[in-house]
């Protein structure tokens, strides 16, 4: 593996670029959600979320291959094998085109039947729901074909392009939010049409960039049986993991609709908007880190790989904790400040989904390491099998009369079971030390979280809800979290590194 310091700098640079993108996207996304919710109303907002969720369930067929495409492209770059890259890219596009056709067929038969026969949608809005369904299918197919292009950008670590195109997408969605307010037709249908149009524009933006900058990203129809066998072999087992994640997220959304109706789907949809905005911090960091984990494995540098896994897990959690704690202690006030309409159940949904996101965050580097090995059969059978339990358990509990938030509580519990399974399996696959992981990551983040959370949580009971309370509690949460991370969460070398960086920044400011 090349100089670790150089690789770390690349990770830092790419993370910084993605953070600049993220801050803009987060602000735009949250404001867009407010405008869209108020323009559509709670019921239509919930309908759009759950109908889109039906289409998203078909990603079970594509998600596994998407991971395979990313892994194969990144792995070949790590080995420096340029000759094989175009074969992989062209094969990937061919596969995605075929899958798009299969998914459209399934959606127009099984999906359409489920929407019209089983879904809990008011009769008066069923016509609009069907239009949303059609445009959601088209949008999904377009995004599916974009996967090989996105994978190439990330594998080449060209995060500036990824950032700029994502910003273009966010601006498009913000424009849509304002346009639906003055819609000349049914607002829900108009919204679905415009979202599809944005997907088409972004698809061409990714394709144009890749063709200009990466020689392998020129599509030729290739039918290499050996390569396709390798990719499908990898994807076949990864299918279990992809299916379990889709069934957990979108299946849970559909189950909530069956028992609780579209207004609760709206509450869950808002919670996931908050989660997506906050989770962008970790997503951006892992997008920059993932190629280095895969490339270090391909180059045989397992020591550097382990360092990345441990540090990546802790940093992922700390980023989420720093953002989530102020929201967890001020959820009701933030939602009222952000939205004019706050659907019932939204507060608890938001709090639970943030806890779930933190629970999942420490597994991201482990998942990347597993994918890097290519030996995923046992992993996917066990971990994917555990995740698949989300849907039947949630269905059973809702049928027994439990509150809708139980779906997220089930997901949190199973997430912890999956973490344990990942560690046991990866000990055999890559030799990861469970004791080191528990000591350096798991127990570390638990202690940091408890110490950081106690002062702001206690303070919430002694200050009346207001902007002053929001400001005080948020500042207190930030100070406690940063202090806990620095003094407890960081080791000596990491504290020294932080001190050096702060001294460097101070010196530059003083010279000016």
Model regions: which residues?
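Membrane-interface junctions at transmembrane-helix termini in multi-pass inner-membrane proteins
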Residues: 138-168, 178, 189, 354-386, ...
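Helix-loop junctions and terminal segments of transmembrane helices
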Residues: 63-79, 155, 214-215, 271, ...
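Membrane-interface helix-loop junctions in multi-pass transport and translocation proteins
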Residues: 37-39, 43-44, 157-160, 171-204, ...
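Transmembrane helical elements of multi-pass membrane transporters/channels
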Residues: 13-30, 194-211, 225-295, 314-316, ...
